[in-house]
Amino acid sequence: MKLPDLSEFELSEFISICRDHLALSGYTTQQVPLLTPALEEEILAAGKPFISPNFSTRLSDFTHENGFWVTLRHEGRLVGTVAARVDRIGHEAFGDYLERVFSKQYPMEDGPSVKAALPGVLAGVHGDIVYMGDMYFHPEHRGNIAKTICFVRAAFGAVFMKWQSVGMLFAFQRYADDLAGKVAQYGFCSGQYQGVIE
């Protein structure tokens, strides 16, 4: 599952198309290298109830090289976010990685493990993987499918522009969103990129 051979120019053109479409409705996007206390405060003030452990600067270490946020603003006000982080797991199997990381961040006393819930083909994936999460849209800015698609696809473009070695991009989505078809709208499972789980 490798990213097709796209040049940085082609990726930047793709991102520009998405950003231009958003601008037609008064939205701007920005790639922010690190979650600062000011940005975290702004995200929480926009209505997001919490920052997940995987993207919390209190629980995880970040550099300009291993993570970033993409923000969505309308008339200067933050109304949406998504975050991305790369983990270079090398030869460690994806299932083992998830088990190790998520058992610390989301401890459960019973129930199936994260690894046990993975299809066998994914459990053995290794290399450079990107986790995207903390996607949030203010309630007043939900429901516009074209806006959502453009924002998330611009974030995908930013991921692949920054980390062209990525072998897989994954996210956890709510079951209700999956049933409503939103996961495909976001671009996951859509076949948009070979690096996205299909």
Segments (PLM) and residue ranges:
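A conserved beta-strand-loop-helix scaffold within acyl/acetyltransferase catalytic domains
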Residues: 23-128, 133-135
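Generic preference for hydrophobic/aromatic residues in regular secondary structure cores
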Residues: 24-34, 169, 188-189, 193-194
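Polar low-complexity intrinsically disordered regions
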Residues: 1, 75-77, 139
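Sequence termini and other peripheral, non-core segments
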Residues: 1-38
